[in-house]
């Protein structure tokens, strides 16, 4: 979010930032996992996808075992859960085959190797008609599927203090930010503004 806001601020200035800051915001921590998705079809078939939207087929599964933990978990979900998955809903996750799925080493694994991040509703031809980011909906589905809830840092409207602190950050020259974050965690700094009650980032002790 912050990198995106920084680019918007540099290109379009305060006016667009003020508009964004006055809206209802949902801010999630970006997790360094691998993208994994599944979709239930009307015949109760489950289809799996990689990060690029390409389907994971049986040949992929035979030659590449990378997604097996996630696929096996979904395949073994209780029937009562599977049949109640809405048709054509596609559940998106950050997948952890290990505690270091890409570059960052995390202190713990997410529940059943998966963090639910989004749900997209598609039609019969595969076109996305709606994307669900609502925090409550995602939390409810994460509980039903039995995976880690999305790491939501903030959900609501910013206070004047939060707006001023974030603006101050955006207005700070890049070279000063580089110097600052040699000694201070960028993630912890942003969390301290958005949600001071959080004592650590997701999957980190």
Give the ranges of each region predicted by the language model.
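Core nucleotide-handling region used for phosphoryl-transfer chemistry
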Residues: 1-205
């Amino acid at each position: 979010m912050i990198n995106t806001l920084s680019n918007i601020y540099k290109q379009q200035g305060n006016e667009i930032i003020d508009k964004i800051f006055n809206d209802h915001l949902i801010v999630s921590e970006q997790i360094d996992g691998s993208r994994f998705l599944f979709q239930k079809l009307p015949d109760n078939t489950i289809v799996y996808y990689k990060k690029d939207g390409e389907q994971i087929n049986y040949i992929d599964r035979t030659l590449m075992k990378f997604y097996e933990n996630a696929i096996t978990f979904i395949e073994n979900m209780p029937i009562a859960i599977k049949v109640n998955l809405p048709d054509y809903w596609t559940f998106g996750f950050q997948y952890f085959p290990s505690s270091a799925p890409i570059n960052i080493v995390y202190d713990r694994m997410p529940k059943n190797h998966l963090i639910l991040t989004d749900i997209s509703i598609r039609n019969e031809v595969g076109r996305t008609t709606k994307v669900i980011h609502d925090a409550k909906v995602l939390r409810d589905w994460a509980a039903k599927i039995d995976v880690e809830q999305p790491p939501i840092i903030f959900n609501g409207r910013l206070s004047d203090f939060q707006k001023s602190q974030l603006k101050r950050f955006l207005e700070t020259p890049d070279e000063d930010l580089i110097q600052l974050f040699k000694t201070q965690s960028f993630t912890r700094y942003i969390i301290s503004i958005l949600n001071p009650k959080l004592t650590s980032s997701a999957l980190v002790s």
